[in-house]
Amino acid sequence: MQDSVSSKPKLLVVEDDYENQKFLQIFLKRKFDLEICDSAETFYEKLDQSKFDIILMDISLRGKKDGLQLTRELRATEEYKNLPIVGLSAHAFQKDKDNAYSAGVDVFLTKPVQNDVLMDTLVKTLEEKSGIKA
């Protein structure tokens, strides 16, 4: 849902670490109109308030629901079943990747991730899944 005022695609960053939030906000705003949330509660508030073109999901989100659960819930709805989701986690074991893909992420990245890899992955996933160029 690219904003008509801003020609940038809308990205929702789901990340509970404050330092990571700040970095991602500075780095990703070059190509995306982004909003950040830090919990399942604020995640659903953001979804109610705006339409997003892509989500960057912290798989290890702390709280009542982690990023895997949020991804499963999105995939179970008609409205969000095809929304591009890039999963991000510090856990790099094969079972972690398998769990993320089973939940419904389109791409799984391991923290720390190189800046250019993160940006390229978001741009490529958005274009491949939605036909939207960042």
Mark where each language-model region is.
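Active-site residues of response regulator receiver
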Residues: 58-59, 89
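A short, hydrophobic beta-strand element within the central beta-sheet of small alpha/beta folds
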Residues: 81-92, 105
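C-terminal output helix
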Residues: 113-122
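Acidic, metal-coordinating helix/loop segments flanking the phosphotransfer/catalytic sites
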Residues: 36-54, 62
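Short amphipathic alpha-helix used as the core "switch/output" element in two-component signaling
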Residues: 66-81
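Conserved acidic segment of CheY-like receiver
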Residues: 8-19, 24, 54-55
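Two-component/phosphorelay signaling modules centered on CheY-like receiver
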Residues: 17-36, 40
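Alpha4 helix (beta4-alpha4-beta5 surface) of REC/receiver domains from two-component response regulators
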Residues: 69, 92-107, 120
